Amino acid sequence: MLEFYNIVKSAFYRVFAGIIALLLTMSNGINAGFNGDIYPYESNSKVFGLETIERGQGVTTDGEAWYFSGKTSLVKIAFDNQTVLAYNYEAIPEEFKDNYGSAHIGGISYCDGYIYAPIEDSKVWEYPIVAVYDAETLEFTGRYKILPNDIMTRGMSWLACDKENGLIYSSHSKEATELYCFDLETFEYVKTVELSEMVGKPQGGEVYNGLIYIGSNDMTRAVYTINPVTGEVTKCFDRIKYEWKLIDNFGGEGQDVTVYPMEDGTLIHALDIGALFMDSNLRHYKWD
C-alpha cells in the first residue's frame, strides 16, 4: 500500500509541476507581449505563486527595506528580495471588518517609522480609512480615521505622505481630476487641488523632491508626476505598450510605485502583477 501511495504521490507532483510550468510559460508569454519595454527597466525583483498575493497591491520603502501590501496583508522584505523581516497577514483589524466591511488595502506610504495604509470596503465605497502601522513590526498602532466619503467618493486606492508639508494625498480611484489633501497628523481634510489633466486608475504614489510620483493602471500603466501645489500632471513613461480591454486587466495589472535613489542608479520602483496573476514584479527604473 505504501509503495502504491508513493507512486501516486510522485505522479501527482509531476502533473502539478507540469501544470505550473505551463501556466508560467503562458504568463511569461503574455507578459512579453504587453511589457514592450516602452521605457527600459534596469532590474526586476520578481516573485511567483503565493508570494504574489502578499505583494499584489502597494509598495513603499524607508531606504532600508521594501514594504508591500496585499489585499489584507503587510510584509517587510530586505533588499535581497528574499529575507522576510516582518509580516502581518491579517493587517485589517477585525473591528474594521465587522463595523465597516473593510476588505482591501491599497497603495501604502512610509513616513517617520510608520506605514500609512488606505483601507476600503471594496466596491461599496462607504468607509475610506487611513490606518497607521508600526514599520518595525507592521502591527496596527490603533491610529486611524474614516475620511469623508463625499470627498473620497470611490473608496481609497492609494495615499502618499508628504512629511515636509505635513500632508497626505489621495484621489478618485478611477478618474483622478483632483488631488485631495489631508493633514498628516489629524487626517482632517485640508484642501483640493485641481489637476491639469485626468490620471486614469491611480494605484499608488510617493512624494520625492516636491513631486508626487503616481503608478497607474491606465491603458499603458503609465507612471506620472503631480505637482501638489499647481496640480500640473506630467507623464514620465509607459510601462506597457497597450492594454487590451476586451478582458479587464488582461495581461496583468499596474500597481503602486515608490521612489528612492539606489546604489545602482535606479530611482523609480514600480510594482505590477503579471498575466494570469501568478507573478509580482517590482521593476527598477533610472530617472533623471
Regions found by a protein language model. Give the residues of each.
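Short coil/turn segments that connect the beta-strands within blades of beta-propeller domains
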Residues: G63-E64, D112-G113, E164-G166, N209-L211, ...
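Loop/turn-rich, solvent-exposed surfaces of beta-rich toroidal or solenoidal domains
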Residues: E197-V229
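Short loop/turn segments immediately following the C-termini of beta-strands
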Residues: K71, E120-S122, S171-E175, N217-M219, ...
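Beta-propeller domains
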Residues: W66-I92
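Structural motif
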Residues: S73-A78, V124-V132, A176-C181, T220-N227, ...
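Surface-exposed loop and turn segments in beta-propeller and other repeat-based domains
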Residues: N35-G36, E42-F48, L85-G101, F140-R154, ...
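Repeated scaffold domains used in trafficking and secretory/extracellular systems
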Residues: I53-T60, D98-G107, D150-C161, M198-V207, ...
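Beta-strand-rich domains and repeat architectures in extracellular enzymes and scaffolds
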Residues: V47-T72, H104
